[in-house]
């Protein structure tokens, strides 16, 4: 369970990011609720920790997150500041993965699939259509950057979760077990004998 938070923890620990050791220790001690762990670290309610966690993992902007939290802009800013101060590895991982996407034009999932960032946009803030490199150069000149890199963590985490789920489905199939349905990070199967489920 909690596939995406575990992947965030995995990637943050690979990079040795500050603060992730507390989550790893909790996991190793049998505490498997990432949102509660983060709630305790940041001293904020679990529901707010979960909303912020998932919002950041899925590339939500501050305004959308504020609306999801149902708080004023000032309260949202305080929550974000507290969260990032007490749970620094999430923002550090987001920034690291965004830089990788900007520099390399891709991120690789757990099993090596490439998530590409092939479109470009002007460096300045505004509403612009993302374009292929040559078209962006022709329209905006050399002041361009890769578009949508703010979604890099989402692509890494969701893509890696998909890798894991698909691999599990293949392994089940090899064992003669056919999943009936896949919902998020869950595979539902039927067994004839309860011992098969173990």
Language-model-detected regions and their locations in the chain:
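Conserved catalytic core of nucleotide polymerization and phosphodiester-bond processing enzymes
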Residues: 1-198
């Amino acid at each position: 369970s909690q596939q995406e938070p575990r992947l965030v923890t995995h990637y943050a620990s690979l990079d040795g990011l500050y603060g992730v050791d507390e989550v790893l220790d909790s996991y190793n001690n049998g505490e498997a609720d990432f949102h509660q762990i983060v709630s305790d670290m940041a001293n904020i309610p679990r529901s707010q920790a979960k909303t912020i966690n998932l919002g950041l993992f899925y590339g939500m902007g501050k305004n959308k997150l504020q609306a999801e939290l149902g708080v004023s802009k000032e309260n949202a800013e305080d929550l974000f500041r507290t969260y990032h101060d007490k749970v620094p590895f999430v923002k550090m991982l987001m920034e690291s993965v965004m830089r990788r996407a900007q520099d390399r034009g891709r991120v690789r999932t757990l099993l090596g699939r490439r998530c590409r960032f092939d479109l470009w946009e002007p460096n300045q803030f505004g509403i612009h259509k993302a374009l292929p490199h040559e078209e962006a150069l022709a329209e905006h000149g050399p002041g361009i950057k890769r578009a949508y890199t703010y979604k890099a963590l989402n692509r890494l985490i969701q893509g890696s979760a998909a890798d894991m789920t698909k691999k599990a489905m293949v392994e089940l199939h090899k064992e003669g077990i056919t999943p009936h349905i896949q919902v998020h990070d869950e595979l539902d199967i039927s067994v004839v004998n309860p011992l098969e489920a173990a």
